[in-house]
Amino acid sequence: MKVRTDFLCELNQKKIWLRREDLIKEKVTGNKFRKLKYNLIEAKKMNSKAILTFGGAFSNHLYATALLGYINGIKTYGIVRGNEWKEKLKENPTLINCVNNGMTLIFVSRDIYKKKNNCAFWRIIKLNPSKFYIIPEGGTNELAVKGCSEMLDKNDNIYDVLCCPVGTGGTISGLIKSSTINQKIIGFSVLNYNNLKSDIDKHTNKKKWELNN
């Protein structure tokens, strides 16, 4: 399918349009595909045997990683926040779809999950991180931003303001990087995360953007 932009309405003499990123690829929609696109290319380039990533029990990122890993013949591992879901797997369609697409799920408590950026985390779960191509929670890294920057092309220069929800900051960072000097980017944060603005600043030096909680 092809991404399209649909007219929604006119408000205060301003026309509002909706970018249909959900049409980009069957089953893996919008920014998830774009975030993983270049990470998968890099994993293959590095001859990685497996991808490991992180997410909550209803994480679209985990599902997208599992499906694209399956399609590309790369084994996937998902660290799931909340070890109670190990006993409730059948109640969770997201995790069931992950398993059905070949992902090995590793359930950890919320306290342990908070340590995922520390060396001690890997000792606790008894895995060697050097054995995996690791993608952070939510999928945001430089390669994800590169993929998300492809949302815009010269045909989008007609828009004055671009808005999007913001989780880990990858999508808005891509939009900021590929926006023109005359465009403003507005993000609406969906998470309670104090360092989000500084994380976005790491990916771009442009200043014509704002983040609303």
Language-model features, listed with the residues they occupy:
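PLP-dependent amino-acid enzyme catalytic core
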Residues: 1-213
